[in-house]
Amino acid sequence: MATAQLQRTPMSALVFPNKISTEHQSLVLVKRLLAVSVSCITYLRGIFPECAYGTRYLDDLCVKILREDKNCPGSTQLVKWMLGCYDALQKKYLRMVVLAVYTNPEDPQTISECYQFKFKYTNNGPLMDFISKNQSNESSMSSTDTKKASILLIRKIYILMQNLGPLPNDVCLTMKLFYYDEVTPPDYQPPGFKDGDCEGVIFEGEPMYLNVGEVSTPFHIFKVKVTTERERMENIDSTILSPKQIKTPFQKILRDKDVEDEQEHYTSDDLDMETKMEEQEKNPASSELGEPSLVCEEDEIMRSKESPDLSISHSQVEQLVNKTSELDMSESKTRSGKVFQNKMANGNQPVKSSKENRKRSQHESGRRVLHHFDSSSQESVPKRRKFSEPKEHI
């Protein structure tokens, strides 16, 4: 039994490099971060069935990793897309991956939710500016700091995906790849992709923009952003967002300090995991988060071997993640276990579905937000930049 356990653990472990001193080690980390992020998002948003995922361990965290499955053509297709991303990433062409969710199979340009993964390649070696905007000091990025940031980013994604309102039952996926045009050959296309013909998208409803987090290595910067409908944020635990950002109106737009040269704008609702932990240390009973479905029983064994390099302690994780066994299972819920109460109108009549409300509000106000991922406000006519889209949608 002990031998079997020792043999199983290395096979199922998803290990981030303990030392990042070469560009190859950094590339391995960024690829794995992208894989874990996409897998976490698609799993907790219920896009693919359970059979499309395998179990892996990320230090003390049990995660589900997307895999090819003959019974799930969609997951197989997404894995192929990811391989195309890896090709562009390895060549240092890839600037941004946009994974978008849409509801009308005939209209993939009108999306309901999207996830942006941005990549930067640095030439400064191990010296880079990773301090806040108010502190311009440069400091060496240690492997320990990178690993902590990686674990923290994955945990932030978990928390957000658990608390967002559910997606419609039937959704489709598409992916757009954007490049650094100055170094990317005009005729380059990753495996499984073709030249895109529609750079912008139309967002259903009122979009909310969230900066989830980033990870820096001596050679790469990896950043994750999420755009979702405002109504999916209505039931989110407000303590997840930093107090400073909560006070800011939803309509207030702030410039993303890391991409000012691209003139991209995001609202100020950044996830603040550190603030959430501090509040729960003072008042542990205030947490209302459910336990991720990604955490299986074997994870309790892994927790006893927790690495000292983790960005948050075991006790903080326990305060952050609560059991969901006592929740009312008759209510609607997401795969993560988060329960959403059905709103009632006129005392006992359920309100119309969110999709019906969305269509009605769009008809009344004409609000369908056109979003260009790569346009500059300084240009009267936005410059068309090279991008790719899949040969086949999911």
Swiss-Prot record:
GO annotations of cellular component type: chromosome; nucleus; synaptonemal complex
Domain HORMA per the UniProt entry, residue ranges: 24-226
Claim: Protein biosynthesis is one of the keywords in the record: no
Post-translational modifications reported in the UniProt record: Phosphorylated at Ser-377 in a SPO11-dependent manner.
Chain coiled-coil ranges: none
Subcellular location: Nucleus; Chromosome
Positions of the UniProt region annotated as Disordered: 252-394
Primary residence: nucleus
Presence of keyword Phosphoprotein: yes
Keywords: Chromosome, Differentiation, Meiosis, Nucleus, Oogenesis, Phosphoprotein, Spermatogenesis
Stretches with biased composition (Polar residues): 310-324, 343-352
GO biological process, alphabetically ordered: blastocyst development; meiotic cell cycle; meiotic DNA double-strand break formation; meiotic recombination checkpoint signaling; meiotic sister chromatid cohesion; oogenesis; regulation of homologous chromosome segregation; spermatogenesis
Residues the record lists as Phosphoserine modifications: S376
PANTHER family, per the entry: HORMA DOMAIN-CONTAINING PROTEIN 1
General function of this protein: Plays a key role in meiotic progression. Regulates 3 different functions during meiosis: ensures that sufficient numbers of processed DNA double-strand breaks (DSBs) are available for successful homology search by increasing the steady-state numbers of single-stranded DSB ends. Promotes synaptonemal-complex formation independently of its role in homology search.
Subunit: Interacts with HORMAD2. Interacts with IHO1.
Protein name: HORMA domain-containing protein 1
Species this chain originates from: Macaca fascicularis (Crab-eating macaque)
Gene behind this protein: HORMAD1
